[in-house]
């Protein structure tokens, strides 16, 4: 089933047809509506977020805020259908064979003696997918400079910088992304990715785009996995027709 947004209302474009004896058709009603309504809701929300991002990659980051494990995992599936390039939900990745993507947490940084050591250790572990979270202490005075230091050391050691960059998770994302982009470019890393998270939705992403932000990758969690501004999908299951059936018999009395 596919969905679209018309005006301010979510609408179903295609229909599911169930042909069955009435009792059997009624038995599956609740299951069908539960599955279709929830996942159509999340897929629709995701498509709006992806549209606002204007072609940038959207990662589903919502498991911790979803309404339970099942909603988080099936919601991740729906988000992939809606246009996400990956999910942080490892179980969803295993069950549905979709890309698992993510970075590290602030707690990773704080568990090391200093930010540089945390970055260096992470880069040693994941050299081909090295996105460093730079806002634990001070984004522009500490985080970005330490990330640049690690990237420089990787390049000098001959380690291919195949996919690398930084993630912003707080503050004025438009301003910080512009400053960080300038610092990365001047250090010789024009292809470094700038990713962002922090309670994003399609409206905030659109606003950041209008402000000329330098973010090209987005991690969207709470608003996507819960469809926070529109928390239910009004799909219905209705009886459309009842077909009469003929009775065939070889009993002459019945024929009369």
Where do the PLM segments sit?
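Single conserved hydrophobic/aromatic residue that forms the stacking wall/gate
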Residues: 1-7, 248-256
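General structural signal for secondary-structure boundaries
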Residues: 4, 67-69, 214
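Buried, small/hydrophobic-residue-enriched core segments of structured protein domains
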Residues: 9, 16-190, 200-204, 210, ...
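Acidic side chains
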Residues: 135, 169, 216, 229, ...
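Short glycine-rich loop/turn motifs that provide flexible caps or phosphate-binding loops at active sites
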Residues: 5-6, 81-82, 218-220
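Gly/Ser/Thr/Ala-enriched C-terminal appendages of enzymes
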Residues: 182-187, 192, 200-250
């Amino acid at each position: 089933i596919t969905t679209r947004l018309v005006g301010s209302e979510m609408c179903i474009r295609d229909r599911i047809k169930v042909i069955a004896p009435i009792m059997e058709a009624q038995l599956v009603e609740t299951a069908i509506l539960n599955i279709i309504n929830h996942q159509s809701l999340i897929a629709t929300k995701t498509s709006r977020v992806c549209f606002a991002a204007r072609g940038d990659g959207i990662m589903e980051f919502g498991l911790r805020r979803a309404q339970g494990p099942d909603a988080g995992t099936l919601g991740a599936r729906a988000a992939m259908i809606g246009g996400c390039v990956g999910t942080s939900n490892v179980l969803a990745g295993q069950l549905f064979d979709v890309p698992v993507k993510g970075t590290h947490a602030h707690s990773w940084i704080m568990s090391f003696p200093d930010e540089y050591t945390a970055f260096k250790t992470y880069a040693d572990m994941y050299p081909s997918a090295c996105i460093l979270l730079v806002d634990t202490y001070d984004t522009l005075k500490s985080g970005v400079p330490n990330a640049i230091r690690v990237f420089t050391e990787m390049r000098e050691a001959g380690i291919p910088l195949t996919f690398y960059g930084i993630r912003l998770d707080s503050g004025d994302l438009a301003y910080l992304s512009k400053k960080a982009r300038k610092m990365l470019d001047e250090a010789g890393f024009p292809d470094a990715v700038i990713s962002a998270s922090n309670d994003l939705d399609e409206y905030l992403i659109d606003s950041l785009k209008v402000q000329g932000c330098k973010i090209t990758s987005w991690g969207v969690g709470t608003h996507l996995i819960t469809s926070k501004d529109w928390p239910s999908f009004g799909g219905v299951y209705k009886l459309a027709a009842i077909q009469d059936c003929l009775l065939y018999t070889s009993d002459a009395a019945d024929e009369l």
